[in-house]
From Swiss-Prot:
PANTHER family for this protein: L-ECTOINE SYNTHASE, PTHR39289
Protein name, per record: L-ectoine synthase
UniProt record, GO biological process: ectoine biosynthetic process
Coiled coil: none
Pathway: Amine and polyamine biosynthesis; ectoine biosynthesis; L-ectoine from L-aspartate 4-semialdehyde: step 3/3
Record organism: Desulfatibacillum aliphaticivorans
Top-level taxon in the UniProt lineage: Bacteria
Amino acid sequence: MLVRQLDDILGTDADVKGETGTWASRRLLLKKDGMGFSLHDTIIYPGTETHLWYKNHLEAVYCIHGKGEIELVPSGELIPIRPGTMYALDKHDEHLLRASEELRLVCVFNPPLTGREDHDEDGAYPVLDD
């Protein structure tokens, strides 16, 4: 059984800050854990917009704090996010994630992340080996 506390991850290599300065991802489960998915406690900073397009991964997200919205690209459809909202990017959906308040999101990725990933110029994570 794996048991981790968020406090044990903060300030370690598993506490990743995006180069864009718009998010932080506390990576609770990673590829090396052998679960077949990775699990993240993610903060999106207020007043930010992040372009995301996970071409290599599927992601499910559950909001536990804050408010924001997703804008689907290219349709422009807006989807509000608030506590209790779940969305799943089951079609590798390109989107803009905006936080009007600090968002705290629980995110699951398949295939799992190794922990070293950051978004590329298209907003995607590469698929990395251990």
